[in-house]
Structure formats: structure tokens, C-alpha cells
Amino acid sequence: MSAKKKVSSSKAINLGEAKLQASGIDVKLAKQLGLHYLDGQQTQKLHKVFKPLCSLKIDYFDVAGKPLADLPRAKSFYRLRYLETPTDFQSLTDKKPVRYVQEPNTAPVAYYPKNIDWEELVVDADKPLLITEGELKAVKACQEGFPTVGLGGVYNWRSHRLGIEWLPSLGVVTWAKRNVYI
């Protein structure tokens, strides 16, 4: 007997589709891209540090389209984009609420959107490559024909805390003599 997968609430789906549409992303491609709409309960179930808010789960893949881990023998990497604004005590401050989160003690990973064929592109230095902050911006750029690697933040090409000076997931790209736009 197979386990039933819980279906996200209509609220999570509506918020997720609205976010993708606002980013100019074709919502019909969400599943193919590894984007999943989660309700608050599903979000919090992933890890105890996550707030019980609707979110967009962004799965990461290597250049071959296989799930990507941040470190050897680790589980598949993902990040969350909260789709709601927190209403807890901490949210009453003037600080901008955190929108993107990942599990504690995970390393940054390069995001290769699945709407581009990366395997040939990463080894062909004659083809230009773009790098941007944000997975959704990378998806949109690839959707428009601009091969773009996404980073979860402007410094997410390394992790001093984990002793990573250059992400292994970026090491698969032939960088020498390639035009790169950031």
C-alpha cells in the first residue's frame, strides 16, 4: 500500500502561483522545475526552525537534473520562500522579515534551473553564462533564453563557516575564457 502524499491547501497554491506569476514564471512549469507549494503545517514539518507559514519549496538539482546535496552524504538540498508575512512577536520589529530560509548547518549550493539543458552548456566556454541572486530570477532568465545560475545570496558562492572557498556545485562549470555576467 502506498503512502498518500498530503495535498497543499488552496491558500498555499494560490499564494505560490501568485508569487510565480509576479516573477513572470510560467506556473505550469512549477512541478518540472522542482517548485512545490506548501501550507504552514507542511512547511514546519520539514524542520522545527521553519515558521508555520505557506511557502514555496525550491528543490536544487545538479547540471544533469538530479537532486543535489550541499555536502557529501547529505540529503537533497532545498530552500524555502515564505509566501506569507509572519505575525509573531518578532515580526513587530522594524526589521524586514526573512523571506528565504534553509535548514540550519547546510552549505550554500548553486541553483541550476531545470528549464535549461546544463550538461553541454557548463563545459562549452564559448557560451556565455549569467549569475544572479535568487532562484526565481534564475528561473525567469532561463525561461527567457538566458542561461542563468542562481545563488541564494550575494555571498552564497562560498561558506567561510564551513571552510568552503568555492562551491563544488560551481566547480562543474568551465569558467576560463567564458563571458560571465553577474
Question: What residue spans do the PLM features occupy?
Answer:
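Short, small/acidic-rich helices and loops at N termini and domain boundaries
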Residues: 1-60
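Phosphate-handling DNA/RNA-contact segment within nucleic-acid enzymes
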Residues: 45-178
